[in-house]
Structures are given as structure tokens and as C-alpha cells.
């Protein structure tokens, strides 16, 4: 028995190699973030007269002040992005939960066919839909408007529906039957039993949706190139307005990164739980 344990034990040099490899990968990923953060606190004069890798001396908020009060109007871009994210998260989450519950727990003709057809839309590249969606929004007079940005993508996501359906199907049928016998309707079962049990996967989907919409560039750039701008489009506009003044661009990048890092820290436990549950199931 002891010999089998010793054979199954990983050699120390193998464990050391794994940790060294992971540390190196983490270092490579963190370096660009640190570089961006350091440059954001340099004044344009400091950046021009010193190495890009030198620490700011002294740290300056000039770049932040410039982008928040300049012609790009970065403050409005922050507000617009927050509104887009909130509307997208609420719209996608509510519609995805309802659709997933219907596909998982409600019997109706053609349920499996409709589900797989809906899931098949994941295979369609987003770039293929850009021109049809733009023409539809333009016909409705929604180009260069807030609703033009959110309307095409505010409803159920196939990816979210698939994950939620798999999670909902893991709930024992006996619990659903007991709630039905007690007089609970479908909506009460959904929001009193199914949703609370599925909190880890829902939290993960919220984080994925927030990150996806916060970083969205192609569609907002096409449908609302001038106004209203989101953070990514406003950051790109900084390069042309200020002749690629990199301290301004890095200040904008820092503003965009901080909320995502904070969100990850808050939702980290739920993400780990979701991954663990997915692995068990």
C-alpha cells in the first residue's frame, strides 16, 4: 500500500516545474497591466523625457483630468457603458433563465428541436450578422442611439441558456413535484427553488456578461460611432484626437480595467463554486 502511494506521488521537481511555469505565465499576463497602470500616472512631459518603463516622478493625474474633461467626453462614455451593461445583464439574464427553465422543466411539442436550433445559432459568426443588424437598426432610426447598441443583444444568449438548462436539469424532480403538490406554480418554483439553487452558475454568467459587454467594441463602433460612445470606442477615439498620446490612452485603459478587477474579486468565490459544480456534474 505504501509503495503504491509513493509511486502515485508526484516528484518534487515536477511540482516545482508546474509552479514555476504558472508563475511565469502569471507574470507575463500581469506585466502589461502594470505597464499600463504606471504610464497612466505619468504626465505627457514625463513620458516624453523618460523611459516608458520608468516610474512616474512624481505621479500625476493630468492624463485622467485631460480625458475626463476633453472633447472625447470620457465621463459620458463611462455612464453610457454602465447603462449598457446594466440593461444587457438584466435583459439577458431574465430571458435566459426563463428560456432555460422552459427547455429544462416544461414539456411542449418540439422542445428538443427548438432548443438545438436555438443552440445552433452559436455557430453563426457575429461578423456575419453585423450588416443585417445595422440595416435593421437604421430602418428603425436607432443608429447613433443607446437602444441601437443594446437592442440586438439584450435577449437570451444561447450560451447562457445552455449552461442554465444543464444546471436546472440537475435539480431532483422530487423537489419540483413536492412544490407542485403544495400549490406552487411554475414561476414560484422557478424563482423560489430553481434560481436560488443555481446561484453559482448565475453569478458566473453575470460576470461573463458584464465583461463581454464592458469590452464590446465592434458593434458599438459601427452603430454609434459618434454618440453615444462606450468606453472602448471612446478609448480608440483618444488615439486620433491626441495623436496617440499614450499616457491618455493608458489612463483610459486603467479606468476601464479597475471595475472589472473589482468585480472579479467580488465574484471569485461564486466562480470557483460554479467550476466545482460543473466538474462534479
Q: Locations of the language-model features?
A:
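ABC-family P-loop ATPase nucleotide-binding domain
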Residues: 1-5
Amino acid at each position: 500500500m505504501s509503495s503504491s502511494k509513493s509511486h502515485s506521488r508526484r516528484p518534487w521537481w515536477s511540482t516545482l516545474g508546474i509552479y514555476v511555469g504558472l508563475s511565469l505565465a502569471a507574470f507575463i499576463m500581469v506585466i502589461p497591466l502594470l505597464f499600463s497602470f504606471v504610464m497612466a500616472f505619468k504626465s505627457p512631459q514625463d513620458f516624453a523625457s523618460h523611459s516608458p518603463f520608468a516610474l512616474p516622478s512624481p505621479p500625476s493625474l493630468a492624463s485622467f483630468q485631460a480625458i475626463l474633461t476633453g472633447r472625447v467626453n470620457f465621463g459620458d462614455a463611462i455612464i453610457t457603458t454602465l447603462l449598457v451593461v446594466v440593461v444587457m445583464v438584466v435583459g439577458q439574464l431574465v430571458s435566459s433563465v426563463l428560456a432555460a427553465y422552459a427547455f429544462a422543466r416544461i414539456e411542449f411539442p418540439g422542445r428538443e428541436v427548438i432548443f438545438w436550433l436555438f443552440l445552433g445559432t452559436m455557430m453563426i459568426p457575429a461578423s456575419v450578422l453585423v450588416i443585417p443588424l445595422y440595416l435593421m437598426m437604421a430602418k428603425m432610426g436607432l443608429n447613433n442611439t443607446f437602444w441601437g447598441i443594446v437592442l440586438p443583444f439584450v435577449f437570451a444568449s444561447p450560451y447562457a441558456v445552455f449552461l442554465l438548462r444543464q444546471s436546472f436539469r440537475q435539480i431532483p424532480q422530487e423537489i419540483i413535484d413536492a412544490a407542485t403538490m403544495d400549490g406552487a406554480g411554475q414561476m414560484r418554483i422557478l424563482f423560489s427553488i430553481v434560481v436560488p439553487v443555481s446561484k453559482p452558475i448565475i453569478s458566473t454568467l453575470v460576470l461573463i456578461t458584464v465583461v463581454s459587454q464592458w469590452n464590446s467594441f465592434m458593434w458599438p463602433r459601427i452603430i454609434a460611432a459618434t454618440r453615444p460612445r462606450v468606453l472602448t470606442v471612446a478609448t480608440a477615439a483618444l488615439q486620433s484626437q491626441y495623436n496617440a498620446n499614450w499616457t491618455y490612452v493608458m489612463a483610459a485603459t486603467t479606468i476601464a480595467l479597475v471595475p472589472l478587477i473589482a468585480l472579479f474579486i467580488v465574484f471569485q468565490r461564486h466562480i470557483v463554486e460554479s467550476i466545482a459544480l460543473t466538474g462534479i456534474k
